[in-house]
Amino acid sequence: MSTFASQNESKQSMKLNDIAEFVTDKISSSGISLDRYVTTDSLLQNRRGRETAQNLPPMPCALTHYRRGDVLVANIRPYLKKVWYADSEGGCSSDVLAFRVKNGHCPSFLYTVLMQDAFFDYAMSGAKGSKMPRGDKDQIMRYELPIFTPLEEENIGNMMVDIMSKINVNRQINDNLEAMAKQLYDYWFVQFDFLNEEGKPYKSSGGAMVWNEKLKREIPKGWNF
């Protein structure tokens, strides 16, 4: 995703720590449900948000207490571009950075900043470690971005949230269509339970099957490969 910074070269710049801070509030893992727990593994690559974590920590521990409107970014392997605009309250593991917008700035604008390729490239430029590079928190907060008015921030942020919402809806539609295609293929070419002339599943209703030497399996009578 292209950065908006190149379109605003004439604007003065500020640093990320001028509009945001790391969340330091804590919450016990025993005080949240699984669907409110966020880890680097539950954050999805390429700005796809998150999925439900596999499990809570085995022992009660302190987690970063994120809130609605915070922006969560996986700090391990920043090039994977794992970011989520929180729509709920919960806890996240220590390898997830939770950013909270400062007073006078727009949460959705912060999300727009932190989802840009330029931000992830910058985070990688200061990352430490080879196998599992980890972003440098001090360096991350020095990331530069253009200065916008509060109204401009709101307009930019709202536009990006709207775009990402549409992308996610389209992605869900595509996922559903793919699942339907796989199910249809399975019915036709694995189970051979496509509908016969009577509207019943072919094989399950006693449809004739013959051995195919090439495929080494039975197939519906009359089919050729």
Model-derived regions, located:
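Glycine-anchored helix-breaking recognition loops at helix->coil/strand junctions
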Residues: M1-S2, T40-D41, I76, K82, ...
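Amphipathic alpha-helical segments
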Residues: K11-Q12, L110, Q139-Q183
